[in-house]
Amino acid sequence: MAFLEDGNHTIVTEFILLGLTDDPVLRDILFTIILCIYLVTVSGNLSTILLIRVSSQLHHPMYFFLSHLASVDIGISSSVTPNMLANFLVKPNTISYIGCSIQFTSAVFLATVECFLLAAMAYDRFVAICNPLLYSTKMSREACIQLVVGSYIQGLLNASFFTLSFFSLIFCGPNRINHFYCDLAPLVELSCSDVTLAVVITSISAGFITLTTVFVIAISYSCIFITIMKMHSTESRYKAFSTCTSHLTAVTLFYGTTMFIYVMPKSSYSTDQNKVLSVFYMVVIPMLNPLIYSLRNNEIKGALKRYLGKKIFSYGNLFCKTHYNDTHQV
């Protein structure tokens, strides 16, 4: 049942997600593409986490943050992708009121955590390049744990503000969300109550998160670039800058898309364009992050080669021993 009668009002109990398209051919194509992206996202980020855990060479603060970033990327993608895939197969694709709030809250929580993790990683690079002698002190295990825990706490705080805003909205009319997941903008459009308070609270909260993390990242990289330019050796400059390129690429993709979706005036682009940007933000970027950090990072590539080399060597020894035993038994 999509509606309940509450006195003189009709209360929405479930929503219909319209998804990306109604074209049956395009739906099949998109289903295949997004399913492949999701599988690569989960496998790629899990591989990153496992590689960091098993490789002692990667037991450094930067990779500690990266392992948490990979976990968050799996969560972000998993919060919307399974439901999006179901939308391609089932019509209409409904989601309950509580289910919508859970999806909405989890997406906000994980995106906020990612913002602060990216800021923590920028600070880590700042200390490593600008204050290398103090690196072991400033980026101790305790400090790294505090930064990660702080990221999750900020995620919970921001998600709580968005959750309260969601439950302050009353839905008594149309229940068709013109999106592939429960996002704030289409929910506000469907609300039949005053949305001013909800919009103000979420705008202030999201604005604070964005400005704080962007400020930390901008200051960190400004100091990094100044330090790099002061280096006399070209090789030293290249080595220092190469340690930042992966993170800088990830930051540019994440914040560039975020700014376009949530900062640009809605009149400047259509709802369909917003959906495409949201797919890139929620589905594609979590897949790209492990590729960015692995392809542009010599330490990760080296650890992967060593790990695969050990596996191949152990399997080779096992095969030789088995073959040797079989030969002598004959």
UniProtKB/Swiss-Prot annotation:
Disulfide bonds join 100-192. One of its GO terms (molecular function) is olfactory receptor activity. It is a multi-pass membrane protein. It is found in: Cell membrane. GO terms for cellular component: membrane; plasma membrane. Gene3D superfamilies: Rhodopsin 7-helix transmembrane proteins. Residues 50-57, 124-136, 221-240, 296-330 are cytoplasmic. It comes from the Eukaryota. InterPro entries: GPCR_Rhodpsn (IPR000276), GPCR_Rhodpsn_7TM (IPR017452), Olfact_rcpt (IPR000725). SUPFAM superfamilies: Family A G protein-coupled receptor-like. The chain crosses the membrane at residues 29-49, 58-78, 103-123, 137-157, 200-220, 241-261, 275-295. Glycans are attached at residue 8. Its main location: membrane. Keywords: Cell membrane, Disulfide bond, G-protein coupled receptor, Glycoprotein, Membrane, Olfaction, Receptor, Sensory transduction, Transducer, Transmembrane, Transmembrane helix. PROSITE patterns: G_PROTEIN_RECEP_F1_1, G_PROTEIN_RECEP_F1_2. Belongs to the G-protein coupled receptor 1 family. This is Olfactory receptor 5P70. It comes from Mus musculus.
